[in-house]
Swiss-Prot record:
Pfam families: NusB. It comes from the Bacteria. InterPro entries: NusB-like_sf, NusB_fam, NusB_RsmB_TIM44. This is Transcription antitermination protein NusB. It comes from Nitrosomonas europaea (strain ATCC 19718 / CIP 103999 / KCTC 2705 / NBRC 14298). Belongs to the NusB family. GO terms for molecular function: RNA binding. NCBIfam families: nusB (TIGR01951).
Length: 167
């Protein structure tokens, strides 16, 4: 998936006024790293170190960022295999941004069971609204909803009590 596209910079972080939470910033930074990995084929460790040098990194949840970036890249092939049946085209045909968002959401559904799937999907939708194409958030929502039905069926039948700190 090599490309000459430039890596989209993380938006809305200057000053972080009104920033929703540290995990959202961690997801945005992980998105940037996964995107960079997809379009450049760069080394995961180097990408992670580069992103940790941005001036606002201290505002993010560093361990969560590292878990997302390293986890997605380590399990990318398996995650893509889980995503593919729910797509209307080959995963290689997705935009790198939307593919990265789907990888993050799928990783969280599989490897972060303490995070409610609705929170995972909502965060992915917000990433797609900020960084994806015009209707990318609708596509991401549809794919992750289908994945949640398979990966988190019990949770969907019996949703956990709402906890604002879990997402």
């Amino acid at each position: 998936m090599m490309s000459t596209e430039t890596v989209p910079p993380v938006k809305r972080v200057q000053g972080h006024k009104g920033y929703k939470n540290r995990r959202r910033l961690s997801r945005e930074l992980a998105l940037q790293g996964i995107y960079q990995w997809q379009v450049t084929g760069g080394n995961a460790r180097d990408i992670g170190m580069q992103l940790q040098q941005v001036s606002f990194f201290s505002k993010a949840d560093g361990p969560y960022f590292s878990d997302l970036l390293q986890g997605v890249l380590e399990h990318a092939a398996d995650l893509q295999t889980q995503i593919q049946p729910h797509l209307d085209r080959q995963i290689a045909e997705l935009s790198p941004v939307e593919c990265s968002i789907l990888l993050i959401g799928t990783y969280e559904m599989v490897y972060r069971p303490e995070i409610p799937c609705r929170a995972i999907i909502n965060e992915a939708i917000e990433l797609a609204k900020s960084y994806g194409g015009t209707d990318g958030h609708k596509y991401v929502n549809g794919v992750l909803d289908k994945l949640a039905t398979r990966l988190r069926a019990v949770e969907l039948q019996h949703p956990p009590a709402r906890n604002k700190d879990s997402g």
